[in-house]
Each structure stands twice: as structure tokens, then as C-alpha cells.
Swiss-Prot record:
It is found in: Nucleus. Signal peptide: none annotated. GO terms for cellular component: nucleus. Residues 1-51 form the RRM domain. One of its GO terms (molecular function) is RNA binding. It comes from Schmidtea mediterranea (Freshwater planarian flatworm). Its main location: nucleus. Residues 535-545 have a biased composition (Pro residues). PANTHER family: NEOSIN, ISOFORM A, NUCLEAR RECEPTOR COACTIVATOR 5-RELATED. Expressed in somatic stem cells. Also detected in testes where it appears to be expressed mainly in spermatocytes and round spermatids. Probable nuclear receptor coregulator that can have both coactivator and corepressor functions. Important for maintenance of the adult pluripotent stem cell population. Residues 26-46, 72-112, 122-131 have a biased composition (Basic and acidic residues). This is Nuclear receptor coactivator 5.
Amino acid sequence: MNKHGKVIDVMISDRQALIQFEREGDARRAVDREKGQSFRGNRIDVRFASTSDGSFESRSEIPRNRSPRPLPYERDSRDMSPYRDSGRDRSPADRERYYKALRRGDSSKIIEEPENLNNRHGSPDSYRKYDRSRGIVEEPRSRSQLHQDYPVIPKEIQEPKWNSPPFTDKIGTERPGFDAAIIVMSSELLSYAETIESRLQRQIALTTHIIVLKEESHANACVEDLNNKGVLYAFLVNSLNEQHFSCTLRILYGTPQEHRNMPLNNALTFVARNFERYQKHVRDLKTIAPKPTFDPSRMPPGFIAPDDKIIYYLHLLADSRMLTIEELNEVIDFVQKRMQALASAEETMEKAPITGLPNESVQNSMAPKLSIPGNQPVREEKVIQHQTQLHSKILNILKPVPHQSASGVVDNEINNMEQFNTYNDSNISTSKSNNMVINPKVQQALDTLMQSQFRPTAPELSAPAEENSRNFQPVNNPMANPYSMNPTPNMRPINPHSTQQRPMAQGPGGQPFGNSFHGYYQPPIGQPIFRGRPPFQPRPQYPGY
């Protein structure tokens, strides 16, 4: 607007701006030339400000809307009076002219001054704010009567149809009404901050916001608060930056960056390119993350579909792009939720009964195998129960059935029992030779247990002979076992744990049998040597046969 004439004051609100020229002709020329022009892709409407009756008034301003909740380090916005030099602080010369005008009584030259320059509202704050942003303008708390003569703005100007919403840094999250914040360390640097602001608005079309700090130590807290509010850029300016025409640039969105003492021209070029990439990033959020084409009702139970944000992050990871820690945490949380849902669904399917399978083995093979810690105790209990059942079945098989009592049949049964005992002892001795590391006490207990399990008792000798004949085959049958002989009643067993010398049993031709029937019975004098074996033992190979 400076090309149409000298501008005295500019008032900017959310949806309109009021520009006051020094001369009325300049204002009419600006209206004729700027009406219907395009600004940032939108058509603008330029007209004269008027009162409620439609008449033109040279000094026209709009009421200021109250901004959102002020920052914790801000003080009230400095009101922009048309008689003040762009809202800058009073110099001692201005303050002296103010008091001289009061003494002379010339009210036309009185410069508006706040009630208390040092403490405007009674409680000093650590920060002071110089607000000329687009969209965040605060109304003075104690001087609202200064704006009573403002005209009524037409509804067409208050709510133009061409107004566009602000950019969004994240999906569904709106940022404040400015893109860049210019933070100055003292009020003497406001002129340099205004220079940066004008170049940002003219060259890059960024909405800006000027903040004045009272102490430099509050700069980090101010930048952190701006980052939480979603501001894109922050320019930090001190006295040295003004001398060297430089600034400290901080990029707050995405991966934070800081460029200290960067020349202003280079900083503006860098911000222009970065802001263009940011706009492309916002547009890509809608194009790269399409809506899912699958039907959730056809998905398996426990399936969690990713939203647009997660799909976009996954595309970036697939393209080897860099993500921030917050974005990676969102992806990790989604993956963990999906894993938990799938694990719970598989656990439910495992507990449900499975029907229509051919047998138990196929059912066990088709059952899902989960590595969930909660199923481990259940499996251990099943294994222990299965082992207990097998142990009981083995004991039932090996446990002798009570039998009967005819002398010949009893002798055959005793012969079979003793032969089976001899065979088990031989197997125990063989296992002992294979595994040398066996506790002697454990071995003695096993021998005693085997002796007690297979030794016939007195009631067993009184069982009927018919039952014994049905369950046992006589071993003295030459066709069944031609090498066996019935033991005589005067055969006495030898204690296997005694130190008595045991003679080696002899086979046909005087050859020893070996370790299979080593000395469990000592025949009396004149009796033949015992040469029997259990029916299920394989036939030993003797030399000479």
C-alpha cells in the first residue's frame, strides 16, 4: 500500500485489515487499483470504511477482538494509536513533550500515554509483548473507552466469503494465527524487528508476530512455548544482530533446527524454500495417505486398521525418510496395539473347542502354537498329568495278578517270575555299565523295589490253578521252550546284595551263558544247572549251536 501514498496506521484483525492514509486522494487511488485483486490465491475486496449511516469518516478503525488466551510471558498488547509511532516505546523526548503540552493546555498535541510506564497493571511480568500480528490483537483492559467512536463495519467485510483457513501442521490440529515469531531482547530493537516482519510478509507472505522480552534468559522458555503452540519459525534478534544485519533462526516444526547469526538475506531465502516444502508436506498428507479400500467386516478378528497418519508415517519409513521421536512413538504404539489384539484373538480361538477333526493327533497338530507366557503353566500341568498316567499304566502292567495254587502250576509261575526278575536285574546292570554316574543309594532302592514288586506272596499261592493256566503258558513245554527246566522246591534264592560267591551258569558244551543269568539261583547238589529264560527274551547265541 505504500505505493499509493503515505500510510499512517494499519489495523489487522482476523478477517479484515484497515489502512489509514495521510491523504484522502491516496486512499481513493488505493481502492480503485486494489479492488478485485488476488492475494495468496484469494480475491480481496477493498472499500472505504464507513459509519453506521454510510457516511465516510477519515479516522476509521475497527474494534479489536480479544485474542486467545495470552502466553504466560506476555503483557497486554500495546494499543496502536494513529498518533503513535508504530507502537514503539516512548523516548525521553516524547515524554517531555507530553508534559509540556499538559502545562500549556494544548490538548491537540498531547501524546497518549499509559497510566504507568513501569507497571501498567500493578503486577510486573517477566515479559512484555509488542503485538502486531494478524489475528491476535488484544484489547486494552483499562482503556476501552478510547474505541467508543469506532464505526460499525459492514457484515460483508466482517465475514468475507473468500477467507481461507490457516495452514495445519498436523492432521486435525490447528496452529495459531501466525507462522513466524520475531523475538527481540529489548524495545530498542523494534525497528529492526519491523524490518524483518515487513520482508517476511512481502517476500514470503508469512503472518508474523513480534514479542519483546524483558530478559534474555527467558528466550528458551518463549521458544518452547511457541513450539508447543505449533508455530513454524522463530527469529531471535539481539543488539549484535542489528549491527551485523543478521538473526538467529529456529525451525520449530518437524526436526528442530537452529541457525545462529545467520545473515538476514540468507535466512529469508532459506525460510522461503522451507515454507514451500512445508506447504507441499501439508498437501501430501491428503494425497499420499488414501482411504483404505478393504472392508473391515471381512478382516480377521483382532485386526486394527491404521489411520491416515499411521499410513503416511509408514510410507515415509518405506521411502527411508526421517521421522521424529514423537512420530516413531505413534507407529510403535500402533504396532503394539495390533500385536496385543492378535494375541488375544488367537488365545480365544485356542480355548474354543475344535470339532470335525479325524483324531486327537490331528487336532493337536492343527492347534495354533502361541508363545504367550500365560499358557506355559497349563502346558506344564498337561505334561505332568500325561507322565503320571503313563507311570500308572506301566505299574499296572508290571504288577502281578493274584493266582492260585496247584503245585505244578505254582512252580511254573515262580519260575516265570524269577526269570523275569533275573532279566530286569540284567537290564539294570547293563544300564549301570552304560551310565557310570549313578548314586549307589538310588540303585539299591531300585533293586529293592523290583524285588518287592515281582516276589510272590502267600495269598498268591492259594489262587486256583485254572486261572493260572488261562493266563500263563507253561514253560516246561518242549515245543515252547526246549531249553527250559522247572525249578525244584529245594531251590533257594541268593540275596543279590550279599558277598556270597555266585557260580557261573554253564550252557551246552560247558560254555557259560554270560551276564544274562548270572548266579540268581544256586542249585542243590546233584541237581542240574538252571538254564531257563523269559519267553520274550531273544534267544542267546551259544558257540557250537
